[in-house]
């Protein structure tokens, strides 16, 4: 009877061993598996996932992260997932600390974070994991923390590859300029630092006579950047190889477009629409890229699977492929998947 089968499936008393064996034999024969999702819905438990990310404007890197986060939650509709996003100013430490305090106040079931402020992130993660709250990282992962999963590009290797793409075909290059974001009092981003280290390692291995000159540009002030680029290349007219280790190569390509400059090779990172448009028009020569939105999606999905199914990802550290984009293949990446 249905009642007997129900008692066997839920390990209740009142069933003989002979009957229990018959029921399990039939279950194994037909390949029955319990509907885990139906069981979850019947429990009516809500799960709160907190995501801590910087404020962003349309077209910026963090919009890709946001899109991946929200897509993962939308695809899990019906599983009682409550998403709370705490935004902060990535150039202000106190703003990040406020997002951390908000997270602790909420007492979430899981945390998604891209660490920018390393020490504060470590303190937050230590607090949460001491309460058995799982954490998923993207971009970078600070050492000495427990976490469920990490999704991101192999950063050092991407910097090494970038150097090969930029100067590998021309061993006579004597100087490369790196323009990176002036972060004020905020610490350098670990992802840019690791790419920078990889780039220098390549030069040391393959072109030790080439120097890398570092300059800071503004993330927001267009006129300041125009003056900066004008002044630098007036003083360094022979420098023809340019790199930025963050997602803002389009700031440099805008200057090149306005000034009509076509004799320089610019390499950048990340598949922002502005970068990809510049790649198409030739002001950016190469983009080294990852699928940021997919990484954010997978990170949040790993948290949901753990909360709902108690399922850990197959791997703790999940490194994405490194995509090399040129004007000849960029159209295939402009299509939304």
Give residue spans per PLM region:
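Amphipathic helical "hinge" segments at domain boundaries
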Residues: 35-94
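N-terminal helix-turn-helix DNA-binding module of bacterial transcription factors
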Residues: 1-44
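Hydrophobic alpha-helical segments within soluble ligand-binding/sensing domains
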Residues: 150-176, 225-226, 275, 291-308
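Proline-centered loop/turn at the N-terminus of a beta-strand
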Residues: 110, 132-136, 149, 175, ...
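Hinge/cleft segment of the Venus flytrap/periplasmic-binding protein
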Residues: 26, 30, 186-187, 203, ...
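Hinge/beta->alpha junction and helix N-cap segments in small-molecule ligand-binding domains
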Residues: 54-63, 85-95, 152-158, 180-198, ...
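Hydrophobic alpha-helical
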Residues: 110-129, 213-274
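Flexible loop/hinge segments that line or gate small-molecule binding clefts
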Residues: 120-157, 272-280
